[in-house]
Regions:
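His/Glu-based metal-binding/catalytic segments typifying zinc-dependent metallopeptidases
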Residues: 39-98
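Charge-rich, well-structured scaffold segments of protease-associated domains
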Residues: 1-40, 108-109, 113-256
Length: 256
């Protein structure tokens, strides 16, 4: 497999080091005899057949906690387009410690040590998920709070205060984002992978500074419709099933 697939043609090597270019290049001379082009991979992703609005229950006997995931397929990754703007939209809902979801489930209710939501995308596929590990006896109540928060944000949108906090938080975080060697490596890899110019950072800063409340609310309505989502719960099925069915959802047993 490695002889056929792992070849250097078309690859790029990125290094962040205190070595000069000549010394670093010399140290990589061991790779000079590695030649060739790997066979192409034909990748395809099957369509999901899950039922939206249902709960898929994975049993773990006597679990003290339940893991909840609520989500759907979503966008592939982009750098300055709708995917990036949607990550800004999600910030107030589930992308920060003081997001609505975390303040509700952790700080107010005490159901979990942390709850969050996020978009995750690659070149071929993407998804949106809201997730937490919660006390087993609060599984049903946690789902209710998740759904209420997502639905409220989708329908009523972001507040002025949340928009300002998002802008300040993202800008402050980005100011330190490329300080470490590992971060610099990731920065360069991102430029090469997406064929970017280094000023994409400035482009993102402009988006953060100028995205409007109306734009964010349109994205929330478009991407956070709970009727388009399904739920996965991992926990003690014999105690959870009656609770989950009492919420009015169809519950399907699922094995991994």
């Amino acid at each position: 497999f490695y002889q056929q697939q792992v070849k250097p043609f078309g690859g790029q090597l990125i290094a962040v080091s205190d070595l000069g270019q000549a010394e670093l290049t010399k140290s990589l001379s061991i790779l000079e005899n590695w030649q060739g082009k790997g066979a192409g991979l034909q990748l395809s992703l099957p369509e999901g057949n899950g039922k939206m609005g249902a709960i898929y229950l994975v049993n773990k006997d006597d679990a003290a906690q339940s893991v909840i995931r609520i989500g759907k397929r979503s966008m592939t990754q982009d750098i300055t387009g709708e995917y990036y703007k949607s990550s800004l939209m999600n910030f107030a809902l589930g992308g920060a410690f003081n997001s609505r979801i975390n303040l509700n489930l952790r700080e107010d209710k005490g159901y979990t040590y942390g709850a969050r939501s996020y978009f995750n995308g690659g070149k071929l596929s993407g998804y949106y998920t809201a997730t937490a590990e919660v006390r087993a006896d609060a599984t049903d109540k946690s789902i209710v709070e998740f759904i209420n928060e997502i639905k409220d944000y989708s329908e009523r949108g972001i507040t002025d205060e949340e928009l300002m906090f998002m802008r300040n938080s993202i800008n402050q975080k980005d100011a330190l984002k490329y300080e470490t060697p590992r971060a610099k490596l990731g920065f360069l890899a991102q430029i090469l992978e997406h064929d970017l110019t280094p000023d994409f950072v400035n482009q993102r800063s402009e988006i953060v500074a100028n995205i409007t409340k109306a734009e964010i609310n349109v994205l929330a309505k478009k991407h956070l419709a709970v009727d388009d989502m399904l739920m996965v719960v991992v926990g003690d099925a014999k105690t959870l099933r009656p609770q989950l069915e009492a919420l009015g959802y169809e519950v399907f047993d699922y094995q991994i």
